[in-house]
Structure formats: structure tokens, C-alpha cells
Amino acid sequence: MLLSTKNLDFFVRKSHILRSISLDVNEKEIVGLLGRNGAGKSSIIKCILGLYAPKSGRILFKGEEITNVSTRRRVLSGLAYAPEDARVFPELSVKENVKLSTWIIEKRQDGETFDLEQGFEIFPKLRDLWERKGGNLSGGEKKMVSVTRALALKPDLLLLDESFEGLSPLVVRHFSNAMGRIRNMGISILLAESNLANTARVADRAYIIERGEAIFQGTPGEIEKEESLSLILGR
């Protein structure tokens, strides 16, 4: 087991945001977190990364408990994150945005370095955009940069928050293919997503998150057959 959360509870003031969330991600697996906006998907991702502190529960990564470990140490141990808003610096080139991760990976004890050619294999379009300023990129291009910057950390688990949001069908297809290539590199993915069809393209399994609870777990095919989930997922 690569990642496991055990009964995570998270509050914002008196609001109970996550309720006893337990989930697992195996090595070389793509797992979806499916649910409506505000269901708690992003909060799960941020608890795993250490940006949010759960009130109770445990987080295990590669067999070690990381519940109270700093975000920096979690990243150094093999977690990486591409946020929904991409956070590409507009005045920096694509090359400079990606290489922001270099100083972190140099601290990794395993000595691994990022192979830029692997990044181009995942998103071939980036080769032509390498010197372009971040402020001159489309939304889809910014997300490519954000994911590549996360991959520059040489993670074991990539956390993606709404990576398909706002993308055209063509770009969604490119991203779906990219996720398959990322898994072929031996990297697992935990993907927060509101669209079942997009998740079904890439995920081995998915958890349905509703009002902070994981109410169902199964393959995308199994989820599609559950009529009771239609209202939750807006199908």
C-alpha cells in the first residue's frame, strides 16, 4: 500500500468538513475522488499534503505515518501536488516555472533527478512552449506546466485537484493520455474530479465523496451502474 488514510476528520471552525475518511492508493494505481463541488475532495488532498491539519485520524505513506509531518518533509518523501488553479508564475518562462522544483529535488536523499525528456514525452507540446512566458499560456497549457513542475519532484504519488476542469474535449483527451504515461513511469495518481466520464477514462478505482464522507468505492464501471449515485454526480 502506497498511501492510506484512516478515519480522517477535519473541521473549519465548527463546520465538520471531512467525516471519518478512509481510503487507499496502491503503487502504480490511479484513484479518483469523485463528488460535487464542496463535497470535500480538495480538503482530502490538502490533508494528505499537510496543507490542512485533520482533527483526528492517521495518514500513512510508504508505510510511515506522516499525519504530523510538515508539508516540506512530505514532498521530500515522495508526494507532489498540482492545484486546480495551476499557479503558474506569469513573468517566468515555462522552463523557469518547471525548474522551480529543482531546489527541492536536490534535497532528496535518493539522489534522483528529473529527466526533462520524460516531461516532454508526457506533454509533447511543452517542447514548443519552453521559452514562452506563463502569462501567455492558455488554461490547458498552464495545467500542463503545473503537472510537469510537480513531476519534476520525482514523486511516488501525484495529487491532482480538478485537472480536467475547464478544458476542451481535445485537451481532456491529451490529459487522459498523459496520466496513462505518468502511471507507466511508476507514479501513482490521486485525482480529485467532479466529472465521472473524465475519471472513467483514467482511474482504476474511485471513491464517491458526499458531504465529507466516502459513501461508495469501486471501479468507474461499477459506479456508472449505481443509479443511486446519479443525483450525487449530476448525471
Language-model segment annotations:
Residues R13, L92-F114, I122-P124, G218:
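ABC-type ATPase nucleotide-binding domains, specifically the catalytic core motifs of the NBD
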Residues L49:
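Helix-to-loop junction immediately C-terminal to a conserved catalytic motif
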Residues A150-L151:
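ABC ATPase C-loop
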Residues L34-R36:
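The feature captures the beta-strand-to-loop junction immediately N-terminal to the Walker
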Residues G57-E65, S77, G111-L116:
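Conserved ABC transporter NBD signature motif
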Residues K133-L137:
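Conserved ABC ATPase signature
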